[in-house]
Amino acid sequence: MKKIVVVHTSLVSHEELTRLFSEIIPEAEIRNIIDDSLLAEVSANGHITPGIVSRMCKYFENAQAIGADLIFNQCSSVGEAAAIAARTVSVPVLRIDEAMAEEAVSLGQRIGVVATVGSTVEPSCNLVRSKALSAGRNVEVIPYLVDGALDVLMREGRERH
């Protein structure tokens, strides 16, 4: 049985991701590491901090220690920390927005990045640029923040968000 360890920065998507993994890979064992201080810290600072990187490295090392076959990083805001942490383990790491960035780069040169969390804008734009560079493509990345959407998500839930 394959084991997937999901590293979360909030409880918001925990149930939905667990359900999706169970539907897509029913034979997989899903384990979760949840640290809601990560999103709060990156939001307060506007970028990842050395403390975030340190904790992400420890979480990835813990995931590897419990036998993960895949580590899934649930949050775009800490995606750059996940990329650093991925270099500390031998387990494959998948970022939640990685496939989206690759697909966007394959589809066009002007790419809009719509984010509902302010701390996600820069890392998501950087990921798209990185994927474009790897693919040998020139792209223009246009960021857009839906201001207040995170507050709606936390107060009113996913449907309203």
Model-based region annotation:
Residues 1-161:
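Non-catalytic structural scaffold of enzyme domains
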